[in-house]
Design a protein with these regions (language model features):
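Long, charged all-alpha helical bundle/coiled-coil segments in cytosolic proteins
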Residues: 47-128
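Start-of-domain marker
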Residues: 4-62
Length: 319
């Protein structure tokens, strides 16, 4: 059984600039249907899911014919889901037509958001989430949640800093006293290797500030934190997922950053580690020369030159 999800993405660009794009993912039932790297299901996508009963491996396929720019999961849908986009441009010139393909997997910025989680994800021997990592996640989500409701609630910047410092102090003290596990109260088996939002803990530690905070501030902050908890869980879920990207372009390849080439197909192989921090970019270009046009221009140019030489020769004779 697969321990991660393997996804093959194929793109075939047609001479008219349109392109056929296909996703094919395989993995166990829990991983294949989660929201770590969801495949498109709505029109114009043709979506299909299957199960191999012999080894309990599930596969899902989604494909469509597209053109121009296609964005998967725009930023206005929140920070959680993995965003990626593809751009295929066709440019027609007098003597040739060029094609450019650009595929971008948006970087998740793990090292900047939660450095401890980044270290845990790079440690393949780690089987569970360290509680210190969980406090780091909570602090990041709290900070972002408070930032996202600034337009709704007006509180002083100094008050925000005091609240954040208070929570840091709570976690630090609990760690020093060996009670970090107790205050997080994460004992459920189905929460293993998954972050969750400790609502009661957060409500309790907002109490010292309740008199200076607007009504419903705490509840709004909790709600604003949820998408960032989802973001952390998706980041963790993407860990060890692998991808292959294959594409064909009309004409002669002039540029690519592909790992390898097989016949006319460009291949890239990578894992989620490639975009865990920075953007991962796939790019390729090709060109089709119009031989008949080039030949006509060459012949036409030669005739013009020949005619010019004849005229010059006649002028010299007349003179």
């Amino acid at each position: 059984m697969l321990n991660c999800v393997e996804t093959l993405i194929t793109v075939n660009v047609f001479p008219d600039g349109a392109y056929h794009m296909k996703f094919h993912s395989e993995g166990d039932k829990k991983d294949i249907f989660d929201q770590d790297f969801p495949l498109p299901t709505n029109d114009p996508w043709l979506y299909e899911a299957n199960e191999n009963e012999e080894d309990s491996v599930y596969s899902i396929t989604s494909q469509s014919v597209l053109s121009g720019i296609t964005n998967f999961h725009s930023a206005n849908k929140g920070p959680a889901v993995q965003r990626h986009s593809i751009i295929v441009n066709k440019k027609e010139k007098l003597l040739f037509t060029s094609y450019d393909l650009l595929k971008i997997f948006k970087g998740r910025g793990v090292s900047k958001k939660y450095p401890l989680l980044s270290k845990v994800m790079n440690n393949t021997s780690s089987d569970s989430i360290d509680l210190l990592v969980e406090t780091e996640i909570i602090m990041y989500c709290l900070q972002m949640g408070m930032k996202n409701i600034r337009d709704k609630f007006s509180i002083k910047e100094l008050t925000e800093k005091r609240i954040l410092n208070h929570f840091r102090g709570v976690f630090y003290k609990a760690e020093e006293e060996g009670n970090l596990f107790g205050i997080l109260n994460n004992t459920s088996d189905d929460k293993n290797n998954e972050f969750f939002l400790p609502r009661e803990l957060i409500k309790t530690n907002f109490r010292p500030f309740i008199d200076i905070l607007p009504n419903n501030y705490v509840q709004s902050c909790l709600n604003a934190m949820e998408p960032y908890i989802d973001e952390a869980n998706i980041t963790l879920g993407l860990n060890d997922d692998t991808f292959k990207f294959a594409c064909t372009l009309p004409g002669q390849i002039t540029h690519s950053n592909a790992d390898s080439t097989s016949n006319d197909t460009l291949w890239w192989s990578f894992s989620s580690e490639e975009f865990i921090d920075e953007d991962f970019v796939i790019e390729a270009s090709s060109i089709i020369y119009f031989k008949n046009r080039i030949q006509r221009i060459i012949v036409g140019s030669a005739l013009i030159i020949l005619l010019g030489l004849i005229l010059i020769s006649k002028q010299r004779k007349n003179s």
